[in-house]
């Protein structure tokens, strides 16, 4: 697999995995932070979702963080989304009337899932992906996996064997899930994919970030992260 460095989606780099860019030999830049409009907490942008208000007053999700206008930031958690909608917090943060879709939570979850699948497809085209039980085993042994993704409907036997190997060769390797084998397969141009290894670098970091945000939106209490550390929203 080819190792990929730099932001996976063309945006500014985040804080996960890697020491960050240095200028003039100084300290690595700290990850940008924003305040969540629901909790009031100041958090790294990696844990937040950006929204903007369109000229007609409608609320627009901006998960890619590229739309013009003042950003409204919300932690990527199901309870934060529910609170923001129920308490009219988008309008309060924007200091104007805001039209919020009734199905905003569903829309944002769909967009977050699409970002995960699209990024996985980009990683495949960049040569940063291996898929299949034997290929993933070989890549793990060679130290060529920065993120392990397993299908939500993977058989327990195969899942446990891959996780046992990951624990043995890379105890800190994140092991995540976010969809079934069929959806993984579509993103990778094949019928199905159960075990997927992502090369260390920008794609592994970007996918881990997006999958964790998606899990938070779904109210996930546990990811298949027996190998890596738990993250915000997995409580």
Regions found by a protein language model. Name each.
Residues 70-71, 126-127, 145-147, 170-174, ...:
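Short active-site oxyanion
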Residues 79-151, 155-158:
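Extended interfacial segments that mediate partner engagement and assembly in macromolecular machines
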Residues 1-8, 35-38, 144, 160-173:
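Short helix-coil boundary/hinge micro-motifs
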Residues 1-87, 92, 96:
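N-terminal cysteine/histidine-rich coordination modules
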């Amino acid at each position: 697999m080819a190792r990929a460095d730099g932001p996976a989606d063309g945006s500014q780099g985040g804080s996960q995995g890697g020491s960050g860019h240095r200028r003039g030999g100084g300290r690595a830049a700290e990850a940008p932070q924003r305040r969540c409009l629901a909790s009031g907490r100041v958090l790294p942008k990696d844990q937040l979702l950006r929204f903007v208000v369109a000229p007609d007053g409608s609320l627009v999700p901006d998960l890619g963080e590229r739309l013009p206008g003042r950003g409204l930031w919300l932690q990527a958690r199901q309870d934060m989304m529910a609170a923001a909608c129920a308490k009219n917090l988008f309008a309060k943060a924007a200091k104007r009337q805001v039209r919020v879709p009734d199905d905003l939570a569903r829309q944002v979850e769909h967009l977050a899932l699409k970002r995960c699948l699209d990024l996985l497809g980009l990683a495949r085209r960049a040569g940063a992906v291996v898929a299949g039980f034997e290929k993933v085993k070989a890549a793990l042994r060679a130290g060529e996996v920065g993120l392990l993704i397993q299908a939500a409907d993977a058989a327990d036997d195969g899942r446990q064997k891959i996780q046992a190997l990951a624990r043995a060769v890379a105890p800190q390797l994140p092991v995540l899930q976010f969809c079934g084998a069929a959806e993984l397969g579509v993103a990778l141009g094949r019928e199905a994919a159960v075990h997927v290894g992502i090369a260390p670098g920008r794609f592994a970091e970007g996918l881990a970030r997006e999958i964790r945000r998606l899990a938070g939106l779904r109210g996930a209490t546990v990811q298949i992260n027996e190998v890596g550390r738990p993250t915000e929203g997995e409580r």
